Amino acid sequence: MALPGTLRFGVLMALPGALASGADPEDGVGSSVVTIVLLLLLLLLLVTALALAWRRLSHASGGYYHPARLGAALWGHTCRLLWASPAGRWLRARTELESPEESGPPEDEEDAEDFVIDGGPEEAAAKEEEQRCQAEQTRDPRDTDSDGGLGLSSQGPVGSGSSAEALLSDLHAFSGSAAWDDSAGGAGGQGLRVTAL
């Protein structure tokens, strides 16, 4: 069943070349227009396939890969990197010196704006949970070994900055453990092997 699909794809890929090679020199303008139209149709087909694949992935993951969520995460990461940079610290210090009496809108107004902008109670609750998790992580970053862990901490080497922290926080989605048995029913089996990811 895969052969007809592969055959169709091969014909589709070879069609612009075959049309361009069989043309007369006087007919060069017409064949280039046909080639461009075919390439644009191929591009449209690829974009449509990408959109359908993304929609299926988003539906299967419960919206985890939605562009709004990914964009918000990327924007938050960019803002954290900006504020951690020397230019961001300088900008923050400068704005604090210029207007210390203006503290901005009260928190209740900010929460109401976030609730309206974010689109509802589900997303607001998710953002609150995310902020609470970040606050717990930043509250006691040096005490990671007290939980009985493997001695791995989210702090990188001295001077590594926020890029190492961002890398380790991105790896959180891949954490877990696995167990398997390599023995094929033989008497010399060693039992289950366990690894932590």
Swiss-Prot record:
Pfam families: PTPRCAP (PF15713)
InterPro entries: PTPRCAP
Major subcellular site: membrane
Domain of life per record: Eukaryota
Region described as Disordered: spans on this chain: 120-164, 177-197
UniProt-annotated location(s): Membrane
Example of a GO cellular component annotation carried by this entry: plasma membrane
Residue numbers carrying Phosphoserine: S99, S103
PTM summary: Phosphorylated on tyrosine residues.
Transmembrane segments: 33-53
Keyword Phosphoprotein: yes
Known tissue expression: Leukocyte-specific. Expressed in B- and T-cell lines, in spleen, thymus, and bone marrow of adult mice, and in embryos.
Membrane topology of this protein: Single-pass membrane protein
Keyword terms, alphabetized: Membrane, Phosphoprotein, Transmembrane, Transmembrane helix
Biased segments, Basic and acidic residues type: 124-145
Self-association state and partner proteins as the record states: Interacts with CD45/PTPRC.
Protein name (record): Protein tyrosine phosphatase receptor type C-associated protein
